[in-house]
Amino acid sequence: MSTQKQIRNIAIIAHVDHGKTTMVDQLLRQSGTFADHEKVVDTVMDNNAIEKERGITILAKNCAVTWEGTHINIVDTPGHADFGGEVERALSMVDGVVLLIDAQEGPMPQTRFVTKKALALGLKPILVVNKVDKPGARPDFVVNAAFDLFDKLGATDEQLDFPVVYASGINGWSSLEEGAPGEQWGPDMSALFNTVLKHVPAQKGDPAAPLQLQISALDFSTFVGRIGVGRISQGTIKPMMDVVVMEGPDGKAIKGRVNQVLTFQGLERVQATEAGPGEIVLINGIADLNIGVTVTDSANPAPLPMLKVDEPTLTMNFCVNTSPLAGREGKFVTSRQIWDRLQKELQHNVALRVKETDEEGIFEVMGRGELHLTILLENMRREGFEMAVSKPRVVMKDVDGEKFEPIELVTADIEEQHQGGVMQALGERKGELVNMEPDGRGRVRLEYRIPARGLIGFTNEFLNLTRGSGLISNIFDSYEAHKGDIGGRKQGVLISMDDGEIFTYALGKLDDRGRMFVRANDPVYEGMIVGIHSRDNDLVVNATRTKQLTNFRVSGKEDAIKITPPIELTLEYGVEFIEDDELVEITPKSVRLRKRHLKESDRKRASR
């Protein structure tokens, strides 16, 4: 009987690259989830193409293992504040959290965000110090830093009394003892499994009570339609059972019938004849499933309050592509197709907001950060969409007639030699130094509070200032009074004056004017940005110029044209680079930059 099933529900929290997905791989392997004949893929939890490429987790996902007769549901949470909507939903399904921290780096801002949410929900943490076998590991420092972090985030005394497990995800072992560096500890992950069984509370719901199942995530299948994922708080659910769906206690009760009930086993979804309290289930057959609704008993409805999600902090305009090259590379180019795709995204991307503007073909899309919105753009681009987007703007709040803006907490890990340049750049962007911590090995950690506006476009500058050796991460802190104007881009751009194809001869002539974004034989059009000017003003250039051929021969060989390689234009770079009067043109094959007004005369008129 499912009512007697021993269940534990845990979420795994970690900063990017601290080893969370590798750790989950090991838990699946060692619990016997993969049969001997199965091929085990690395990073099984990152199953979205962009997640695998970037090594980040975007979508909250579930898997389950069985250890000593107990069914353990593992929810993989995104470590990034931009996917906070995913985080909040994932945490609503669990009773405990495993906080995974790199033994060398210590707690990072993204970890802080998810941990704060988990502690506020009253979840008890288990600290896993990962990668303890790597050189430079500082397990003691990490445990103390985690304690200080929990204390700062308002943890209770019970939450501060957390168990610690030392582990190496890649080598597949864990231990409750710190041991000497280089010493081989426990042979497997049993120390971590046993800690979870001991410290994560078992489900206390009554299987005979009216059903309460809150939907925390949605999936879609072409065969069965919408699929809801959530945890049963109380009661029992069975296939073909009549239920009602309610949006919180004041919501209208919509009748429905459950078709199938599935549970997680490893990475697979298996059909169940019934499921009881504590189980994370997937149900289908009900059309009105949305995130946060409660599926409850039709005779005695017992709805739960709707899930709360933080409001968006950043907004962008998505527009129909109106450039002369529009429609050549994409399959979906009309405003109706873009609008329908954004509406579909809203069904499962709860932190997103979309609204129509007064101008035809322009939609305002609000999200939790630059990464949140550029991942959506990248997904749409891969699906065959073509569009143009504006520079991101922050979402201001009006408090008693005064303008308030979002403030971010930034942590930068840099080499000491780059400290001056980075501090100057953050200072110019209205950043306030909160903390500075040298690690005694030539690197220093800077903590700043800075308006979110000041961070738009800062990533590229930061990488240049630190020669690619710096690490930076940021997290939303609070809304505060507007901090005043922040300067824009320091350099102007090179703008094409004509439609056509760019030639090597023209590139050679423009080489000393600045850095180019285009290569020989690329198509260009009037108003397209072809490069960065070496000065602070915009310059209109002839990018389609060819060499005039005459019937005179010249003595000596012609000079070889020297061309500096162009800047690789990515979607993120483009979105960070542009100013208010510019757009990024996105197609499945290309990313181009352009002026909002393509003709020089229109630009002059608009600037008056």
Model-assigned labels for residue ranges:
Residues M1, S590-R592, L598-R608:
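Acidic, low-complexity intrinsically disordered tails
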Residues M1-I101, E105, A145, L218-S221:
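P-loop NTPase switch module centered on the Walker A-proximal segment
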Residues M1-V16, A103-V224, G235-V245, K252, ...:
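P-loop NTPase catalytic nucleotide-binding module
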Residues K5-G19, A81, P107-K116, G122-K124, ...:
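Conserved structured catalytic cores and adjacent interaction surfaces
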Residues D17, M23, G55, I74-D76, ...:
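Residue-level signature of catalytic and energy-coupling elements of molecular machines
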Residues K39-T43, L153-V165, Q203-Q214, D250-F264, ...:
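Interdomain boundary/hinge elements
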Residues Q212-M316, A326-R328, Q491, D499-T550, ...:
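Conserved nucleotide-binding/hydrolysis modules and their immediate coupling elements
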Residues S323-L346, T564:
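A short, contiguous, amphipathic alpha-helix enriched in charged residues
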